């Protein structure tokens, strides 16, 4: 089954390289994107299996991933590595995410039109087989729960609500690493300007 963790061929190749490193440290890869631009940016989102990753842990992942990428050398051009938490309104990239966040609001987009639409907004209702269940507003029946095959999805993300913020703060506190000043910060490793403590990732 496909997922939304890594979409393109190069993203999937990079994910194959960094996933064992991230999982070996006790974390999970949530999403990976190699973004184009004057200087390419490799964006990695990671989290604890039970949520609550903090900035220092993102820094540790950045250092470990940089070392592996330095050896594998999969990116030809100069690039910047960014390792971050998924944030409060996190992307939903794996089928299990829709079970984990059942009861919370989300926006889902599909690659093709489904009954004349591609965008769906509503409350997640878990999964059934390979389908994502979401309760959406229906003009005729009030609310209806529909199933969307996971392979149909092109994007999915939680919607920022008071309930979601409360849950994320609960996870942070439960992890024992709660520091409001560090909430959702990004650890960046700049190619040629990387500190000696971090493996340089500039490529030519």
UniProtKB/Swiss-Prot annotation:
GO terms for biological process: ribosomal small subunit assembly; translation. Residues 177-204 are annotated as: Disordered. Belongs to the RimP family. Keywords: Cytoplasm, Ribosome biogenesis. Pfam families: DUF150_C, RimP_N. The lineage of its organism: Bacteria, Pseudomonadati, Pseudomonadota, Alphaproteobacteria, Rhodobacterales. The keyword Cytoplasm applies. Disulfide bonds: none annotated. Residues 181-198 have a biased composition (Acidic residues). This is Ribosome maturation factor RimP. Required for maturation of 30S ribosomal subunits. Its main location: cytoplasm. One of its GO terms (cellular component) is cytosol. It comes from Cereibacter sphaeroides (strain ATCC 17025 / ATH 2.4.3). It is found in: Cytoplasm. It comes from the Bacteria.
